[in-house]
């Protein structure tokens, strides 16, 4: 554990950062974030990466913003494992930096948003133990960008059973729900954790009165719509049309979609209803939408979300939105790199890998 803590560095407490009061330092924070955004990989990078092997890609990112992460972890990991850990470490440290350079309401909202990584980690830990994954495989997927430190997550990953993990989370807000986990209802628990996260996030936002909270709320509502739409596509393609099977999987608080209206529609009518929404432009150009792969559809929806964030950022340049734009674009970059590494390790074709990438 000492080695891991040394590699990752000591993590600042998130609890002390969550202050609603105080002055938000928008101008300073946005200026810093613009500099950070300029270091994101340009879209021209991805075709080049697809033509490289794993070792070449690792060397490439070692010469980029991920250099320190690769260098720090190179003594412990190699190949794809090194890349996974370096990407996750970089993402966590990047988000920690955002919390250090923000204050007041701005800091409070960002911290609330980043709690999604605690949800991600809890789901990863449960899934890993349920399917007997090795401790190393579990660690490879953990991202300490929420309140849980990497040291704490490492201790959880080393537990022998999922029940021991749940017991170790007794003091968290997730514990009452996790007590319902019986080893056979993972999908239910994961969905409820997601719903719990968004419910808590909307509670943190409260009734948005300030311009920043209104922008932030709209941003999250758009994200909820995109997530619900992805779920609806999966269910509709599977032939699920019963409201009592679909509605429990929907997240409340979306911007435009009416899941209760879409739930019972057959696939063709579902598509017709989508033509009336802002999301149609995102998927209208998908060839053979009725038979297109879910991967392509979901990639288009994520792309729309990213592009919308950029549009919001241009409309409100000195606000929380440019920072949120950077957060999701940074996450997307890490996801893209992870997809390429995993695809290369699995010997997937460049076409299959490319279909999963979201490149802006």
Swiss-Prot record:
Residues 9-22 have a biased composition (Basic residues). One of its GO terms (biological process) is proton motive force-driven plasma membrane ATP synthesis. Has multiple subunits with at least A(3), B(3), C, D, E, F, H, I and proteolipid K(x). It comes from the Archaea. HAMAP family: ATP_synth_C_arch. The gene is atpC. It is a peripheral membrane protein. Residues 1-23 are annotated as: Disordered. Coiled coil: none annotated. The lineage of its organism: Archaea, Methanobacteriati, Methanobacteriota, Stenosarchaea group, Methanomicrobia. This is A-type ATP synthase subunit C. Pfam families: vATP-synt_AC39 (PF01992). Belongs to the V-ATPase V0D/AC39 subunit family.
């Amino acid at each position: 554990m000492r080695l891991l803590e040394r590699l990752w560095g000591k993590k600042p407490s998130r609890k002390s950062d969550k202050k609603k009061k105080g002055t938000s330092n928008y101008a300073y924070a946005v200026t810093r974030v613009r500099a950070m955004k300029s270091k994101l990989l340009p879209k021209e990078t991805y075709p080049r990466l697809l033509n490289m092997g794993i070792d070449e890609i690792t060397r490439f990112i070692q010469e980029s913003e991920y250099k320190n992460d690769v260098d720090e972890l190179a003594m412990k990991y190699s190949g794809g494992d090194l890349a996974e850990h370096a990407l996750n470490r970089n993402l966590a440290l990047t988000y920690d930096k955002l919390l250090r350079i923000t204050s007041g309401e701005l800091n409070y909202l960002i911290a609330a948003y980043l709690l999604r990584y605690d949800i991600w980690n809890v789901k990863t830990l449960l899934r890993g133990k349920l399917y007997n994954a090795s401790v190393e495989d579990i660690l490879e997927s953990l991202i300490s960008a929420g309140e849980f430190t990497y040291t704490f997550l490492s201790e959880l990953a080393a537990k022998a059973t999922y029940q021991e993990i749940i017991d170790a989370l007794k003091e968290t807000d997730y514990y009452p729900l996790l007590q319902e986990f019986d080893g056979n209802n993972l999908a239910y628990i994961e969905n409820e954790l997601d719903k719990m996260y968004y419910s808590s996030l909307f509670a943190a936002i409260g009734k948005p009165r300030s311009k920043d909270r209104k922008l932030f709320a709209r941003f999250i509502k758009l994200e909820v719509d995109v997530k619900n739409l992805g779920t609806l596509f999966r269910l509709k393609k599977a032939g699920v049309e019963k409201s009592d099977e679909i509605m429990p999987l929907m997240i409340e608080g979306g911007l435009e979609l009416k899941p209760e209206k879409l739930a019972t529609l057959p696939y063709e009518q579902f598509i017709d209803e989508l033509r009336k929404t802002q999301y149609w432009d995102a998927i209208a150009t998908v060839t053979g939408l009725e038979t297109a792969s879910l991967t392509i559809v979901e990639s288009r929806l994520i792309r729309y979300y990213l592009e919308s964030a950029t549009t919001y950022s241009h409309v409100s340049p000195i606000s929380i939105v440019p920072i949120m734009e950077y957060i999701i674009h940074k996450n997307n970059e890490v996801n893209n790199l992870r997809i390429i590494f995993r695809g290369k390790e699995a010997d997937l074709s460049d076409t299959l890998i490319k279909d999963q990438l979201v490149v802006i």
